[in-house]
């Protein structure tokens, strides 16, 4: 297991490339899972250097993710690598019909994902002393190229 604390989107995707290359050099059949938590919290190099009152820096994350996902999906496409991203839901303002929720970072992640699962907190699990010891969650498969979509657990 390898843990990295990376602050920018660029650093995250460079690290993914390096991990995939090194693992494939040593063992081509090894099962690998790479978890990125959380993409919404990561900044870009432009955001880190820019002033908040200047326009244009907010879209740079989506552009970087789009370019990186095209490259990464080609690298891991036919290998035994699971790339898992956690992201945050944001509410779209003024939506009258359809899903009012979206994820940050543009449309590249939803497009390139083979499976997307939305988790929702539905309650708490408490012990006999009424201390919270866990959370009840609902999982909804909202995209699945590997099986039937729109299932719940």
Question: PLM features: residue spans?
Answer:
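Phosphate-binding/switch region of NTP-binding enzymes
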Residues: 57-153
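Conserved inter-motif catalytic segment of the P-loop NTP-binding fold
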Residues: 1-71
């Amino acid at each position: 297991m390898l843990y990295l604390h990376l602050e920018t989107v660029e650093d995250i995707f460079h690290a993914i490339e390096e991990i995939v290359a090194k693992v494939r050099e040593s063992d081509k059949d090894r099962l690998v899972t790479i978890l990125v938590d959380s993409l919404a919290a990561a900044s870009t190099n432009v955001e880190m250097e820019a002033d908040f009152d200047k326009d244009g820096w907010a879209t740079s994350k989506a552009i970087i993710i789009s370019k990186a996902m095209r490259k990464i999906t080609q690298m891991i496409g036919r290998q035994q690598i699971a790339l898992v991203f956690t992201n945050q839901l944001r509410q779209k303002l003024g939506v009258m019909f359809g899903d009012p929720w979206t994820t940050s970072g543009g449309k590249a992640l939803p497009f390139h994902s083979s499976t997307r699962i939305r988790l929702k907190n539905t309650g708490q699990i408490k012990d006999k002393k009424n201390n919270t010891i866990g959370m009840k969650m609902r999982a909804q498969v909202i995209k699945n190229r590997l099986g039937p979509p729109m299932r719940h657990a």
